[in-house]
């Protein structure tokens, strides 16, 4: 929810001026700080033989999705844009620095020839990345889940890899 709140306040700040803009910018900042508390600042150790460890996955910069199922995934959408904007708005480089960490982390599992990330299908990007012992009953720690939601996964990566789109669109 905090990711959505920070993004919504960011959009409203972009569309506002004066005191109203400052108000929404402040809300975006508060929500972003809370959202960042769900992002990994370290790399989860994987045992030898676990696929994610074998391919060298680094969890730093990935978001922990929920307390219920405790997996990481690419759920980012415009949040990196929010962080870069907050960095400029408040002269706080830590926001942009962590946006860069998130961006590099999300790119790790983009499959291309010679780098299939343990997946046999070109173009597949997993929705659920199991970094803990909890899972939905398929695979477990160190593996991907078989569940795949291509719509939002593609949309999220599209936004991540298209920096500045909201500012360009709302600024028209």
Name each model feature, range by range.
Residues 16-19:
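Short coil/turn connectors between adjacent alpha-helices in alpha-solenoid helical repeat scaffolds
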Residues 11, 23-42, 53-172:
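Terminal, non-catalytic domain-edge segments
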Residues 1-6, 52:
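Aromatic-lined, polymer-binding surfaces characteristic
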């Amino acid at each position: 929810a905090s990711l959505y709140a920070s993004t919504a306040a960011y959009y409203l700040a972009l569309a506002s001026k004066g005191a109203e803009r400052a108000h929404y910018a402040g809300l975006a900042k508060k929500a972003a700080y809370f959202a960042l508390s769900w992002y990994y600042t370290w790399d989860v150790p994987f045992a030898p033989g676990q696929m994610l460890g074998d391919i060298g996955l680094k969890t730093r910069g990935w978001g922990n999705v929920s307390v219920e199922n405790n997996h990481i995934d690419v759920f980012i959408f415009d949040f990196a844009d929010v962080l870069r904007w907050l960095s400029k708005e408040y002269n706080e480089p830590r926001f942009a620095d962590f946006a860069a960490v998130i961006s590099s982390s999300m790119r790790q599992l983009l499959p291309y020839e010679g780098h299939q990330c343990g997946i046999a299908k070109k173009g597949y990007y997993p929705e659920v990345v199991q970094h803990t012992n909890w899972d939905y009953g398929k695979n477990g720690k160190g593996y991907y889940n078989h569940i795949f939601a291509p719509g939002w996964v593609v949309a999220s990566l599209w936004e991540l890899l298209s920096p500045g789109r909201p500012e360009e669109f709302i600024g028209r």
